Amino acid sequence: MLARQTALSRNLILTIVLLLCLLTAIGHTAYFYPHLPARVATHFDGQGEPNGFSSKIEYSLLMLGSQSAVCLLFLGLGPLVKVLPVSLVNLPNREYWLAPERKAETVKRVNFGMLIMGISTLLFLMAI
């Protein structure tokens, strides 16, 4: 019982951290918005030369949209394992891990991994 509570509280804490990362990303975008040039390079060729540009509002909306999408994606993928048919879940030995006696623990572990990846991805997007 204690292990179950620990896993639940761990995933709840990570969910809160992921949402805090999203709020930080929104604040990050809002903070740097006034400092952006009117035309922002958004695409680069193989030599690193810019070949695509957007207005600073388009760029900011793109950043906010992609960061929000990443957050929603990683929040939703973990619990989705619970309701998907076993044939749609790509895990090694999925019949073993998604057997009724192990499915709840597997879902918690997958959710944990998705939350960690979501946090890491949002932090990466803020850094670039």
What is the meaning of each model-derived region?
Residues M1-L8:
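Short, Lys/Arg-rich, polar N-terminal cytosolic tail immediately upstream
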Residues S9-P37:
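Short, basic/aromatic recognition patches
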Residues L18-C21, S54-L77:
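Alpha-helical transmembrane segments
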Residues C21-T24, T121-I128:
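Membrane-embedded alpha-helical transmembrane segments of multi-pass integral membrane proteins
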Residues T29-L61:
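Active-site and channel-lining beta-strand-loop segments
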Residues E49-I57, E101-N111:
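Membrane interfacial helix-start motif at the N-side
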Residues P85-E105:
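Juxtamembrane inter-helical linkers in multi-pass membrane proteins
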